[in-house]
């Protein structure tokens, strides 16, 4: 009863306000223009490096992505990716000792549980767009287990250089809010944590290192 009475009193109060509102105004049109850059790609590279990421270049038709990943992380032995371009045989072929080291490739789409990805050295994913103002990359959940984005020691993000926008306003206008994506995240360089003593620690909560491969 008390809840009902409170609700009625609230409605009565709001109705009185509506009755006594003599002048109404349309909602203002708010146009926010974010920062613009002469060269968005150059700014993205500079910002990515400033937040601790490494940036590498590759051509679109380059079949060397496995070699590029191995060049970036030659000591890695356990990889995770659901990208068809990432292949165990090619990762094995580009091991520093000529292919005698055992290399493991886990697929986040086929593991039974997310904790099976624990111990992953390098995760390779594809980003949807990059943002020049802060060096972040939007990564939608195109994999079953999104834990691969956070549980791996290092993260490699493949990004089309033509998909870099100026600012976050442009980014939110372009990201695909598709129901098939249950999750998405902006990642800007490696994980960073700072305490009250202003000590910056990288990799405490996610990847210790991030490499963005522009193609």
Predicted regions and their residues:
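The feature marks the mature, well-folded catalytic cores of soluble enzymes
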Residues: 2-215
């Amino acid at each position: 009863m008390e809840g009902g009475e409170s609700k009625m009193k609230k409605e009565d109060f709001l109705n009185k306000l509506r009755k006594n509102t003599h002048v109404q105004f349309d909602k203002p049109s708010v146009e926010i223009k974010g920062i613009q850059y002469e060269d968005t790609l150059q700014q993205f590279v500079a910002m990515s490096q400033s937040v601790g990421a490494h940036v590498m270049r590759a051509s679109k038709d380059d079949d060397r992505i496995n070699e590029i990943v191995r060049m970036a992380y030659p000591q890695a032995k356990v990889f995770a990716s659901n990208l068809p371009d990432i292949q165990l045989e090619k990762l094995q072929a580009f091991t520093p000792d000529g292919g005698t080291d055992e290399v493991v490739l886990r697929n986040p789409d086929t593991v039974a549980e997310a904790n099976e990805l624990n111990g992953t050295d390098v995760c390779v994913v594809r980003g949807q767009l990059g943002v020049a103002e802060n060096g972040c990359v939007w990564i939608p959940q195109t994999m079953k287990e999104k834990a691969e984005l956070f549980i791996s020691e290092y993260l490699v993000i493949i990004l089309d250089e033509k998909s870099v926008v100026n600012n976050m306003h442009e980014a939110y206008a372009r990201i695909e809010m598709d129901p098939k994506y249950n999750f998405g995240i902006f990642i800007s360089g490696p994980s960073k944590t700072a305490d009250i003593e202003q000590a910056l620690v990288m990799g405490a909560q996610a990847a210790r290192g991030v490499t963005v491969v522009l193609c």
